[in-house]
UniProtKB/Swiss-Prot annotation:
It comes from the Archaea. It comes from Sulfurisphaera tokodaii (strain DSM 16993 / JCM 10545 / NBRC 100140 / 7). SUPFAM superfamilies: Aspartate/ornithine carbamoyltransferase (SSF53671). The gene is argF. Carbamoyl phosphate binds at S54, T55, R56, T57, Q81, R105, H132, P133, L134, Q135, C266, L267, R294. Its EC number is 2.1.3.3. Belongs to the aspartate/ornithine carbamoyltransferase superfamily. OTCase family. NCBIfam families: orni_carb_tr (TIGR00658), PRK00779.1 (NF001986). PANTHER family: ORNITHINE CARBAMOYLTRANSFERASE, MITOCHONDRIAL, ORNITHINE TRANSCARBAMYLASE, MITOCHONDRIAL. It is found in: Cytoplasm. GO terms for cellular component: cytoplasm. L-ornithine binds at N162, D226, S230, M231. PROSITE patterns: CARBAMOYLTRANSFERASE (PS00097). This is Ornithine carbamoyltransferase.
Length: 306
């Protein structure tokens, strides 16, 4: 069903395909606990290309490849000819002759599209300026573990955030509900928001934007945030921080959520900026379980696509 496909954006997949990714993620977690992981990548090589630094994504993905019996090759941009001006298309053509799949963390989403097109090999988005699909899969895996179902959630912060785009894509495909508390200045790209809205209309999903974080969080079972300033946004850092200063997830804000609410963050966190220490280190925090689940969703996607 999924063999040979690329994972660039969750909007490219059907509800049934996303459900399959989630089902296999839970299976992989069980296999890992039992130390009986199927070696579905035996004899296969995956190139991992990084234009941006990575901790959780690199470690989880490289570990996933090895657990499945595959061979990861890690390529930092500074190590290869891309850093000297080689076109992405040429790099992709060459990698496609050597490896069975490509995974990349890139500055521009268009780079992923070129890698997929010219390598003719399954290509997996490890984060772009547009989206972070593997993160969203791990997030909803965590939510289902905590509540037994995919419950609604509230995102507090930058309304154009790349992780948020993937959360909205998952919600839109699966017919769920998400509230976004954000200054009106921050929204996803018009083209991607149009696709999300079209999918939401088909599935019955509810996606609502609020300017008041307290109103958005009221009664929510999941409160989610991300860093205010992403890599590559340093030139607008101070402006963003000023606009977002009232969108910090605090102990006070969490009081407005459901009594059994959890706090989520894709990490890394800037403590004291988008979240208070007392929240991320508190009893409602699910961030470490969330981070662990990155491994199992990576194993799922690799086994299904390659």
């Amino acid at each position: 069903m999924l063999k040979g496909k690329s994972l660039l954006c969750l909007l490219d997949f059907s509800k049934q395909e996303i459900e399959k990714m989630m089902e296999v993620s839970f299976q992989m977690k069980n296999f890992h606990m039992l130390r009986s992981v199927p070696r579905s990548l035996d004899g296969k090589t995956v190139a991992m290309l990084f234009e941006k630094p990575s901790t959780r994504t690199r470690v989880s993905f490289e570990t996933a490849i090895r657990l499945l019996g595959g061979n990861p090759i890690v390529l930092n941009k500074s190590d290869i000819q891309l850093s000297r001006g080689e076109p992405v298309e040429d790099t992709a053509r060459v990698l496609g002759r050597f490896v069975d799949g490509i995974a990349a963390r890139v500055l521009k989403h268009e780079t992923l599209e070129l890698l997929a097109k010219y390598s003719n090999k399954p290509t997996i988005n490890l984060l772009s300026d547009l989206s972070h699909p593997l993160q969203a899969l791990a997030d909803f895996m965590t939510i289902k573990e905590k509540f037994g179902e995919y419950t609604s959630l509230t995102f507090v912060g930058d309304g154009g955030d790349n992780v948020l785009v993937s959360l909205m894509a998952f919600v839109a495909k699966m017919g769920l509900e998400i509230k976004i508390a954000s200054p009106k200045e921050f929204k996803p790209r018009d083209d991607i928001m149009k696709r999300i809205e079209e999918e939401a209309e088909k599935s019955g999903a509810i996606i609502e934007f609020y300017e008041d974080p307290y109103e958005a969080v009221r009664g929510s079972k999941v409160v989610y945030t991300d860093v205010w300033v992403s890599m590559g946004q340093e030139s607008i850092a101070e402006k963003k921080k000023e606009l977002l200063r009232n969108y910090r997830v605090s102990v006070d804000l969490m009081r407005y959520a459901s009594k059994d609410a959890i706090f989520m963050h894709c990490l890394p966190a800037v403590r004291g900026e988008e979240v208070e220490n007392e929240v991320i280190d508190g009893p409602k925090s699910a961030v470490w379980d969330q981070a662990e689940n990155r491994l199992y969703t990576a194993m799922s996607v690799l086994s299904l696509l390659l």
